[in-house]
Amino acid sequence: IALYRIVFEEFLILQLGLFMFKNGTTEVEGIKFNRDENLDNILKALPFKLTNAQNRALNEIIEDMQSNKVMNRLVQGDVGSGKTVVALLALANCVLNGYQGALMAPTEILAEQHYISLSETLKPFGMEIELLVGSLTKKQKEKVLERVKNKEIDILIGTHALIEDKVEFNNLGIVITDEQHRFGVRQRSKLSEKGINPDILVMTATPIPRTLALILYGDLDISIIDELPPGRQPIETLAVDKGKRDKAYNSLVRREVEKGRQVYIVCPLVEESEAIEAKAATELVEELKLEYFSDLRVGLLHGKMKASEKDEIMKSFKNKEIDILVSTTVIEVGVNVPNATLMIIENAERFGLAQLHQLRG
């Protein structure tokens, strides 16, 4: 009974803290947006129809935007469920109301991916979209910062570079964070502080049961996209015994590469460890090149590499210059390589459920 009482007290304090925080944010007067009629023209221009779940999430977001309270919403949906297009439409509605929008992603590759998809859809409607990432030259950065300050840019997409002190928005209306679990609370709030009470939208692909989500993110309203767009094939997940490892490499991997596809192989460690019995990426690359795939292009990616090296490897993989990419969990943040159709995860027991789900996505 004493233990239950302590657990209850902890949850009570957590919930009271979240309740007070949420009360504080909902009582703050935010921006009252209208649902601009041009948003329907953007919707019509999309090369696909939104799913019912996407429409529901979009309506919930627009409803929040139309209120004069600050929006604080979490959009949760599996990888491939179409969260990005919902974020795109929220940003578009913000710009159509005369405000600027910001989208923050955890990696340069993901930020570039968003920049390309938003530009393709929104530039024909006269919206100015720009990218701010660490790899830009000083001169390029200065030009982007100047244009944002002068409101020549409607939507700024970037990495942690967005929260630097030098970044000044003219009229920030909405802040969107992708893969929100990769950012701390302070980082997210630092971006929203660049405007006067902008609406806040955070996105995650990690599946959190609704009750747990309400405990963890009690300060947020939740929209769930629980439906995949038509034509998306379900992911087949298999557990392979260690004894069948050779067969998995020799038949599964080779078969996919011969079809012109690409393969990920994920390891829990970068280098071998005496304390942990698990596959290390650096050793596995050598093993694959010598024993299995001497005729194929095998690449290596891990967290100890410089950011520029990692981006270079991912670009090579995306451009089909690498057949098999051996990696650690640095690839878990939603990079879109449609040609990669198989992933082998070594020592899967060494990963958390959220990590496995993210990798699977």
Predicted feature descriptions by range:
Residues 1-81, 85-102:
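Pre-Walker A segment
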